[in-house]
From Swiss-Prot:
The keyword Ligase is assigned to this record: no
GO BP annotations, alphabetical order: keto-3-deoxy-D-manno-octulosonic acid biosynthetic process
Predominant location category: cytoplasm
Alphabetized InterPro entries for the sequence: Aldolase_TIM (IPR013785), DAHP1/KDSA (IPR006218), KDO8P_synthase (IPR006269)
Protein name: 2-dehydro-3-deoxyphosphooctonate aldolase
Compartments where located: Cytoplasm
Family: Belongs to the KdsA family.
SUPFAM superfamilies: Aldolase
Pathway: Carbohydrate biosynthesis; 3-deoxy-D-manno-octulosonate biosynthesis; 3-deoxy-D-manno-octulosonate from D-ribulose 5-phosphate: step 2/3; Bacterial outer membrane biogenesis; lipopolysaccharide biosynthesis
Length: 282
């Protein structure tokens, strides 16, 4: 098995390369907050020497409640993304939910994300593939790790091989997610880069009746475990005031803790990737 390398400008995304941080905020709440969070991430990652991609959503189309905040929408969201890219010289990742969004989004962002709940929607997969953009596939909570090969095949047959696989937890009974560490290793056997969404893996879906709950206090433990696998990247959302965030605050890392948090993750990644592989199958 060879590790596929995805090139994003000067950034190399691969399971055997230094990890890439995919981070930012869950949903665009305002232009000013997005700029502030992007600036913090940019400064911290530059200081620590961590390759970085800014993440935010312009529309959270799968909220638990019809009354929940969804975001500014595509048109306004893309304007904010353009300003962030220009101001901080950052690559961008965001998610799409409809086929018509793919082409205009791909003109602005570098990586398009396929949401976990939509990962089997063939029309959306094909539309995303045809943009030629790098694709981040969130593993659905209801699929086994080995079933990701079917989604990979759809993208390949639609002409796109620039694929990242993202673990974000699996359903474990009602209102709970667990992370299968061996499942992430199984996805790595595909050769495609695997990243770990340690933020959303902390969710308790529907845990607050009309919104998702979370276990923010365990954000460090879960991410440390994932980084010990030797992954291509880590996906982390942060917020300056998680308790008042408009989406997934219970899972968000407090922004002021970002630097110390990433220092630990980088130390683990550096250590694990300094080891020679051991083939215990023989």
């Amino acid at each position: 098995m060879s590790n596929k390398i995805i090139n994003l400008g000067s950034i190399e995304i691969a399971n055997d390369k230094p990890f890439v941080l995919f981070g930012g905020m869950n949903v665009l709440e305002s232009r000013d907050l997005a700029m502030s969070i992007a600036e913090t991430y940019a400064e911290v990652t530059q200081k620590l020497g961590i390759p970085y991609v800014f993440k935010a959503s312009f529309d959270k189309a799968n909220r638990s409640s019809v009354n929940s905040y969804r975001g500014p929408g595509m048109e306004e969201g893309l304007k904010i993304f353009e300003e962030i890219k220009k101001t901080f010289n950052l690559p961008l990742i965001t998610d799409v939910h409809e086929t018509y969004q793919c082409a205009p989004v791909a003109e602005v962002v570098d990586i398009i994300q396929l949401p976990a709940f939509l990962a089997r929607q063939t029309d959306l997969v094909v539309a995303m593939a045809k943009t030629g953009a790098i694709i981040n596939v969130k593993k659905p909570q209801f699929l086994a790790p080995h079933e990701m090969r079917h989604i990979i095949t759809k993208f390949n047959e639609a002409g796109n091989d620039e694929i990242i696989l993202c673990e974000r937890g699996s359903c474990f009974g009602y209102n709970n997610l667990v992370v299968d560490m061996l499942g992430m290793d199984e996805m790595k056997q595909s050769g495609y880069p695997v990243i770990f969404d340690a933020t959303h893996a902390l969710q308790r879906p529907g845990g607050r009746a009309d919104s998702a709950g979370g276990r923010r206090a365990q954000a460090t433990e879960l991410a440390r475990s994932g980084m010990a696998l030797g992954l291509a990247g880590l996906f982390i959302e942060a917020h300056p005031d998680p308790d008042n965030a408009k989406c997934d605050g219970p899972c968000a890392l407090p922004l002021h803790q970002l630097e110390n948090y990433l220092k630990q993750m980088k130390a683990i990644d550096d250590l694990v990737k300094s080891f020679d592989p051991i083939d215990t199958s023989k």
